[in-house]
């Protein structure tokens, strides 16, 4: 696919699609609750559609009509054995969270995904689930998919310290803990996105959070709710960066989720001197309007507790850093290696091929700016965030063409991405 290059400005206002993390969880909680759940503004990307189909395969009635998703919850014990193996597509969120959901189901399932998912380690979630009494195994010692799982009605509670910062593992264990008899304690290594904690309480569940310690008493019952999904800050991130680095630009992004566990990119933009305004804050929905303008940027250091708050935004932040004066250092981000691709290497290779100066490290990157970018051919390797990062980088290219291979990967999280890009180019 040939990308737009050498644009003179970006202007306009858009609403980014619904938050992917919240969209997944709204389907999961709605399925496990008793009664009806209605979900508004859900993301209809391929990952979330995979989660919806899996729960249909598990016997849940899910209707998509007039822009609203209606889930007829079956309760914690109401899932039924599927006729066939469960297809998780490209979605690491789906396979990990649903492993926890099925921990208390007294039937056997096989879960598989596409080529990318089949390379992602699942031992981080299979190990603690085994401690709870679940029979679960995959391929090689890292438990790569496909996974075979047989849950148990006699699920044991767990006291577990996460060896990595992972909202997916935390959430899988919380879903399992809701079905175990007794008190489970999950201790995070670093604070990660807390959508599961928030939504558990929204659906009538109970937990206590004391710093990084989460305590869940099981078993519990949940009740169907109305869920309004805010815009995804991980999708908004591409426009935030585009507005900062494109010339003569001003972008308004409406209804963006600003949950404090997800706003690391806002902290980075401010540290780099970017012009960013936050208005129309809705404290209940945890959403706001974000406004960015073309800015002179400086390098910064991104590490430690900040990393889990922007892990999915690091590819586009790397592009931002190529347009900042000085050096930007990203470290403590080894988790990038086990995303849809090895994002440390793939981001460095993609942007370096366009003229950037990025040195990959064991746990991040060293990025020297400011770089003039030129044409190149870039492969997404099936990674949606690499595709969108490259499309934004192409906007700055004055010399040559940018070809993007496997651009369809973008449909994973943002099917309307190129439509929104066109509207901003012509805004």
Curated annotation (Swiss-Prot):
Pathway(s) this gene product operates in, as recorded in its UniProt entry: Metabolic intermediate biosynthesis; chorismate biosynthesis; chorismate from D-erythrose 4-phosphate and phosphoenolpyruvate: step 6/7
Main EC class the enzyme belongs to: transferase
Main location as per UniProt: cytoplasm
GO cellular component entries: cytoplasm
Keywords: Amino-acid biosynthesis, Aromatic amino acid biosynthesis, Cytoplasm, Transferase
Catalysed reactions listed for this entry: 3-phosphoshikimate + phosphoenolpyruvate = 5-O-(1-carboxyvinyl)-3-phosphoshikimate + phosphate
Catalytic machinery residues: 312
Known role: Catalyzes the transfer of the enolpyruvyl moiety of phosphoenolpyruvate (PEP) to the 5-hydroxyl of shikimate-3-phosphate (S3P) to produce enolpyruvyl shikimate-3-phosphate and inorganic phosphate.
Family: Belongs to the EPSP synthase family.
Protein name per UniProt: 3-phosphoshikimate 1-carboxyvinyltransferase
Protein species of origin: Streptococcus pneumoniae serotype 19F (strain G54)
Gene name of this polypeptide: aroA
């Amino acid at each position: 696919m040939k990308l737009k290059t050498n644009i003179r400005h970006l202007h306009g206002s858009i609403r980014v699609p619904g938050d992917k993390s919240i969209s997944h969880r709204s389907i999961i909680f709605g399925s496990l609750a008793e009664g009806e759940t209605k979900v508004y503004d859900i993301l209809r990307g391929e990952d979330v559609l995979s989660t919806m189909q899996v729960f249909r395969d598990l016997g849940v009635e899910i209707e998509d009509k007039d822009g609203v998703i209606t889930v007829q919850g079956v309760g914690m014990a109401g899932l039924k054995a599927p006729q066939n193996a469960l297809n998780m597509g490209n979605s690491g969120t789906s396979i990990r969270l649903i492993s926890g959901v099925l921990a208390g189901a007294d039937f056997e399932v096989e879960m598989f995904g596409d080529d990318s998912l089949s390379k992602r380690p699942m031992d981080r979630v299979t190990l603690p689930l085994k401690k709870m009494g679940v029979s679960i195994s995959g391929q090689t010692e890292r438990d790569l998919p496909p996974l075979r799982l047989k849950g148990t009605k006699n699920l044991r509670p767990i006291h577990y310290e996460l060896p990595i910062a992972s909202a997916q593992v935390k959430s899988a264990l919380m879903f399992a803990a809701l079905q175990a008899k007794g008190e489970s304690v999950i201790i995070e290594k670093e604070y990660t996105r807390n959508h599961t904690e928030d939504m558990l309480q929204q659906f009538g569940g109970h937990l206590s959070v004391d710093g990084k310690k989460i305590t869940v008493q099981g078993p519990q019952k949940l009740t169907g709710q109305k869920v309004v999904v805010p815009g995804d800050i991980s999708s908004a991130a591409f426009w935030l960066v585009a507005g900062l680095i494109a010339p003569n630009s001003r972008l308004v992004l409406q209804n963006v989720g600003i949950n404090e566990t997800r706003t690391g990119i806002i902290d980075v933009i401010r540290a780099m001197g970017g012009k960013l305004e936050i208005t129309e804050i809705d404290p209940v929905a945890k959403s706001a309007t974000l406004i960015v303008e073309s800015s002179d940027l400086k390098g910064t250091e991104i590490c430690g507790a900040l990393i889990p708050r922007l892990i999915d935004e690091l590819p586009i932040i790397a592009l931002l850093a190529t347009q900042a004066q000085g050096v930007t250092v990203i470290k403590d981000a080894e988790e990038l290696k086990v995303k849809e691709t090895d994002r440390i290497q793939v981001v460095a290779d993609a942007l370096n091929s366009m003229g950037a100066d990025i040195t990959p490290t064991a746990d991040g990157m060293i990025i020297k700016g400011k770089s003039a970018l030129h044409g190149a051919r870039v492969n997404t390797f099936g990674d949606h965030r690499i595709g969108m990062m490259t499309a934004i980088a192409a906007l700055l290219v004055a010399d040559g063409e940018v070809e993007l291979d496997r651009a369809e990967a973008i449909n994973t999280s943002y099917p309307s991405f190129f439509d929104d890009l066109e509207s901003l180019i012509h805004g």
